[in-house]
Amino acid sequence: MNVGVAHSEVNPNTRVMNSRGIWLAYIILVGLLHVVLLSIPFFSIPVVWTLTNVIHNLAMYIFLHTVKGTPFETPDQGKARLLTHWEQMDYGLQFTSSRKFLSISPIVLYLLASFYTKYDAAHFLINTASLLSVLLPKLPQFHGVRLFGINKY
């Protein structure tokens, strides 16, 4: 029973990234994270860009690829219980505008971090590993796949 619910979706996780202003809010939050890290006096600019990239990708990995289920009681009979947020988004359809945006944003941040770190080897390796760890689970070939049984239940 959903008393006082204002949406008509069975699972609100499926359409949240299509809400008005969510992409702008996402970009503003990443920019705000970068400004906060820049305000810490003993961090150099390359370290700040690498930290921005790593923190962004870690948060994206946790919220999109680790957390399962829905925060709501949904009338879908628990179908979303074993799915991550990424797998629930846009009803599982691949290559939607929201999925493209969330796939391109870490790449853009990676390119910015690589440029501002002047392609330093240590920063480059950290940023590349961070990018791959968040980009590979987004590929259609990994939809519903649990490597080594991790996050299976």
UniProtKB/Swiss-Prot annotation:
Keywords of this entry: Endoplasmic reticulum, Membrane, Transmembrane, Transmembrane helix
Extracellular topological segments: 127-153
Swiss-Prot/TrEMBL domain comment: Ceramides bind to ORMDL3 N-terminus and stabilize it in a conformation that physically restricts the accessibility of the substrates to their binding sites in the serine palmitoyltransferase (SPT) complex, hence inhibiting SPT catalytic activity. In the absence of ceramides, the N-terminus is flexible and permits substrate binding, thus liberating SPT from inhibition.
Domain of life: Eukaryota
Gene Ontology process terms (BP): ceramide metabolic process; negative regulation of ceramide biosynthetic process
Topology with respect to the bilayer: Multi-pass membrane protein
Gene knockout outcome: No overt phenotype. Simultaneous knockdown of ORMDL1 and ORMDL2 do not exhibit any visible phenotype. Simultaneous knockdown of ORMDL2 and ORMDL3 show elevated brain levels of sphingolipids, compared with wild-type animals, but remain fertile and show no sign of neurodegeneration. The triple knockout ORMDL1, ORMDL2 and ORMDL3 is not viable.
Listed InterPro entries: ORMDL
Record's function text: Plays an essential role in the homeostatic regulation of sphingolipid de novo biosynthesis by modulating the activity of the serine palmitoyltransferase (SPT) in response to ceramide levels. When complexed to SPT, the binding of ceramides to its N-terminus stabilizes a conformation that block SPT substrate entry, hence preventing SPT catalytic activity. Through this mechanism, maintains ceramide levels at sufficient concentrations for the production of complex sphingolipids, but which prevents the accumulation of ceramides to levels that trigger apoptosis.
Assembly behavior: Ceramide-sensitive subunit of the serine palmitoyltransferase (SPT) complex, which is also composed of SPTLC1, SPTLC2/3 and SPTSSA/B.
Protein family (similarity comment): Belongs to the ORM family.
GO cellular component annotations of the record: endoplasmic reticulum; endoplasmic reticulum membrane
UniProt protein name: ORM1-like protein 2
Localization per record: Endoplasmic reticulum membrane
Broad class of where this protein is predominantly found: endoplasmic reticulum
Ranges of the Cytoplasmic topological domain: 1-21, 64-105
